[in-house]
Curated annotation (Swiss-Prot):
Binding site residues for Zn(2+): C405, C408, C424, C429
A GO biological-process term: DNA replication
Catalytic activity: NAD(+) + (deoxyribonucleotide)n-3'-hydroxyl + 5'-phospho-(deoxyribonucleotide)m = (deoxyribonucleotide)n+m + AMP + beta-nicotinamide D-nucleotide
Keyword terms: DNA damage, DNA repair, DNA replication, Ligase, Magnesium, Manganese, Metal-binding, NAD, Zinc
Residues engaged in binding NAD(+): D34, S35, E36, Y37, D38, S83, L84, E114, R137, E174, K290, K314
NCBIfam families to which the protein is assigned, alphabetical: dnlj, PRK07956.1
SMART domains xrefs: BRCT, LIGANc
Pfam families: BRCT, DNA_ligase_aden, DNA_ligase_OB, DNA_ligase_ZBD, HHH_2, Nlig-Ia
Protein name per the record: DNA ligase
Length: 674
């Protein structure tokens, strides 16, 4: 790169980093993800390293990110609140570990590892055991005085509970908001001002900087302590000793904290947290690894912006910016017209993303998004990515809902003003029928293994399936002609089709796709009414007598079974030999008869759905909340408030291994807890 180009690139990177730093810390309105920001910073750092003549003392690479708002008084920290060096790969983490071991002459160093909370850094100061000051990190040297707001954070003690508290004690931690509280807050904000926070970090930051402390109190903020600032009259040998002292003082610590003695232990813990991060009740964006010994920390020292004895391993980005290429409109199996976003491909959390959900047309209007706009997308867990906001507006027009179904060109309607969704009401709409077929053969419905979308599309193209019952009249010659089908594959699929005829009524009801009726309600009404004919003869009053069915579900059921087209569908299925009866539940004679169960936390060997089916097959019942009527609570990993309530009510608590033994489903898979 020639000199002029080097200078231009450096100028651009510095301006961009300063701009994005302001958007992140001052406006709480970032345009790019953390990883994208770090990539810009690393590029600038590398150029400055290779071209030292261009390096300046005030470069963003040499300063702690952050700012001090003029809206608050300022507080000087007793010692700098530094940022941490970041790494985005386990390979880089291993290199850092090896560097530490080498610098310490391989002293069999202990390390601590804990989740990195995606919140807002804060410093707390206690004088003689009483909370006297709270401050943001600010620029690392000076922070904003948020003392009155910090006092409103739910789990921060006003007075330290430990005996003989030190005269001066400054500690640091992260202010955050629980996922469930964040969802509730966003619903309230949306209702009152028509906007919502993009993520929980923004919510915590905005709530902590309120001029009215009462608003902060209502936001249900929480605090995790993670590091020592300064303490008089007391010494700690290690980071873990310091944290245990904080626990005695009344602070809440993270449960997912581990002391490691080798790189393998660190990597194993990283894998567990990467795979289980979405089970936590708060957001984390990585893991923090520290040398445990405070004496060794002192030996390793600091750079101008971060400690050498700690590193932050950042998870793959859950947010990224990209361009919205096209808004595609598609038809669901119940006729709902749904928009979805076609994106320029971008890597997010290790996955290439090219689609995102837009939910409905009101969401498009709320986001003010259109084709060509640059958008921020987010992926939480394994759910479909969503568009969080428009970053750069390129298209000034408004995207309008279509007037006609994109599949059959029939008119589309809103059935009532309360509904958000538009529907195609043509019962012969090809797109609806295709979606209906996909649902009908799916695992939780008729469970015809191997009858996937590609098979369905070929049969539709060849006009071999025109009504549901046609599935059961397909011949060997029809299957063997499908792409990539040979003898064994054909035989297996024909067996799966034949086996599906014998499924209980409950699976058929779910497969039929009755509006508002899910799998659980399908099971309930099948057990109650026993046969398809009884359902056709039932009145609305008959349906509402079932405790789990209210007036809206009863109306959906009645409308469905009154429909002449439905009657024809069922008659055709009966003629094809499909079972229309719910078998009597076997009398198990176990202690589950009539017992009420609640499932909580993450189960390793079962899905919630599978565990519920096991319980019901043995005569038990499954409830969604704990009460005095609960007999058992099955507690998986990260069980929350339900487990706490169960303990208060003296409900029998079993873990997954005990549940497997009770049900005779003992698994050979070890139930890993962390």
């Amino acid at each position: 790169m020639i000199m002029g180009n080097i200078q231009n690139r450096i100028d651009y990177l510095r301006k961009e980093l300063i701009r994005h730093n302001g958007l992140y810390y001052e406006s709480n309105n970032p345009e790019i993800s953390d990883s994208e920001y770090d990539n810009l910073a690393k590029e600038l750092e590398q150029i400055e390293k290779e071209n030292p003549l261009f390096a300046l003392p005030d470069s963003p690479t040499k300063k702690i990110s952050g700012f001090v708002s003029s809206s608050f008084e300022q507080i000087k920290h007793s010692s700098p609140m530094l940022s941490l060096d970041n790494t985005y790969s386990q390979k880089e983490t291993a290199k850092w570990y090896e560097r530490i071991e080498k610098n310490l002459n391989n002293k069999n160093t202990e390390f601590t590892i804990e989740p990195k909370i995606d919140g807002v850094s804060a410093s707390l100061t206690y004088i003689n055991g009483s909370l006297t000051a709270g401050a943001t990190r600010g620029d690392g040297e000076t922070g904003e005085d948020i003392t009155e707001n910090i006092k409103k954070v739910k789990n921060i003690p006003y007075k330290l509970k430990a005996d003989n508290p030190p005269y001066f004690f400054e500690l640091r931690g992260e202010v955050y908001i629980d996922k469930s509280d964040f969802r509730k807050l966003n619903e309230e904000i949306l209702m009152s001002v028509g906007q919502k926070f993009a993520n929980s970090r923004n919510a915590a930051s905005g709530s902590l900087r309120q001029k009215n402390p009462q608003i902060t109190a209502e936001r249900k903020l929480r605090f995790f302590v993670h590091s020592l600032g300064k303490i008089d009259g007391k010494q700690f040998e290690s980071q873990s000793d310091f944290l245990q002292y904080c626990r005695k003082c009344g602070f809440q610590l993270q449960d997912n904290f581990k002391i490691c003695h080798s790189l393998k232990e660190i990597m194993d813990f990283m894998e567990i947290m990467i795979n289980n991060r979405d089970l936590l009740h708060y957001e984390i964006d990585g893991l923090v690894i520290k040398v445990n010994s405070l004496q060794l920390q002192k030996e390793l020292g600091y750079t101008n912006k971060s400690p050498r004895w700690a590193i932050a391993f950042k998870f793959p980005a859950k947010q990224a910016t990209t361009k919205l290429s096209r808004i595609r409109v598609q038809v669901g199996r119940t006729g709902i017209i749904t928009p979805s976003a076609i994106l320029e491909s971008v890597t997010l959390a290790g996955v290439t993303i090219s689609h995102a959900t837009l939910h409905n047309f009101e969401e498009i209007e709320r986001l003010n998004v259109n084709e060509g706009d640059t958008v921020l997308i987010e992926r939480a867990g394994d759910v479909i990515p969503k568009i969080v906001k428009v970053v750069k507006k390129e298209n000034r027009g408004f995207f309008k809902p279509p007037h006609n179904c994109p599949s059959c060109n029939s008119g589309i309607v809103k059935e009532n003003e309360e509904e958000v969704a538009y529907r195609c009401i043509n019962p012969e709409c090809p797109a609806q029928f295709r979606r209906h077929l996909i649902h009908f053969v799916s695992r939780n419905a008729m469970d015809i293994d191997g009858f996937g979308k590609a098979v369905i599309d070929q049969f539709l193209d060849r006009k071999k399936i025109q009504v549901l019952a046609d599935i059961y009249y397909l011949k060997y010659d029809d299957f063997i002609k499908l792409d990539l089908f040979k003898e064994k594959k054909t035989s297996n699929l024909m067996k799966a089709v034949a086996a599906s005829k014998k499924h209980p009524l409950s699976k058929l009801l779910f497969a039929l796709g009755i509006r508002r009726i899910g799998e659980k309600v399908s099971e309930i009404i099948a057990k109650k009414f026993k046969s398809m004919e009884a359902l056709f003869n039932a009145s609305i009053e008959d349906f509402t007598r079932v405790p789990e069915i209210g007036s809206i579900l009863a109306l959906s059921l009645k409308e469905f079974f009154e429909n002449k087209t439905v009657r024809n569908v069922i008659d055709n299925l009966i003629a094809a030999g499909v079972n229309m009866i719910e078998p009597e539940a076997e009398q198990s004679g176990t202690q589950f008869d009539g017992k009420m169960f609640v499932l909580t936390g993450e189960l390793k060997n079962h899905t919630r759905e599978q565990a519920g089916k096991i319980i019901r097959s043995l005569g038990g019942k499954v409830a969604s909340s704990v009460s005095k009527k609960t007999d058992y609570i099955v507690a998986g990993v990260n069980a929350g408030s339900k487990l706490k309530k169960a303990k208060e009510l003296n409900v029998k608590i079993v873990d997954e291994a005990e549940f497997d033994i009770l049900t005779g489903k003992l698994s050979l898979i070890e139930n890993t807890k962390f």
